[in-house]
Amino acid sequence: MEKLGEDFFTKPTLMLAELLLGKIFVHNTGDGRCYRGKIVETEAYLAEGDEACHAYRGMTKRNRPMYGSPGTLYVYFSYGCHHLMNIVTEPAGVAGAVLIRAMEPIEGLEDMKRNRGLERTVDLLNGPGKLTRAMEITLSHNGASLSGDTVFIEKREDTAPHKICSSKRIGITKSTGLLWRRYVSDSFFVSGKKAGKAC
């Protein structure tokens, strides 16, 4: 299966937040199981001018992956209960990332349901902490390259047209006025609509 390469991810963060919509994220667990989901919601974070970004005040041990090669994962543990998965963007040395907020389940549904303790497909991946739990993404994936065989984005054309909306990001307290959330407007799998949207 062909994968998207580093050149795809070496783009401005806001552009990539939109280009990732409709793409298929894959996690091969190594024990014969595979999770696949279509990305339907993202948020952009940039060190420059964005106080909500982990790298706003510079590099730390925690945010170091954000300064690495584009097309790697930045996974962190939030509020002691959720892993959140970001895809690093921009050239190496420039901190930027796209948070994956929601996906539409494609493959591995029964394992996702077991991991989440849920039966409703629409609720499995409709939030950044939900999707990592369902797809078994943990801190062990922090810094992982999307050019490998464990986690990657499929190189495929998304033939289904979709309308993209923008809105304020969810669950932050700084730089709240930025319309840096992107989502597929007619998807049932997004984490929630938001005031101030622009479609």
Curated annotation (Swiss-Prot):
Keywords for the protein's UniProt record, in alphabetical order: DNA damage, DNA repair, Hydrolase
Any GO BP: base-excision repair
Source organism superkingdom: Bacteria
Keyword Disulfide bond: no
Enzyme Commission no: 3.2.2.-
Annotated GO MF terms: alkylbase DNA N-glycosylase activity; DNA binding
Gene3D superfamilies documented for this protein: Methylpurine-DNA glycosylase (MPG) (3.10.300.10)
Enzyme class: hydrolase
One Pfam family in the UniProt entry: Pur_DNA_glyco
Family under the similarity heading: Belongs to the DNA glycosylase MPG family.
Protein name: Putative 3-methyladenine DNA glycosylase
Organism for this UniProt entry: Chlorobium phaeobacteroides (strain BS1)
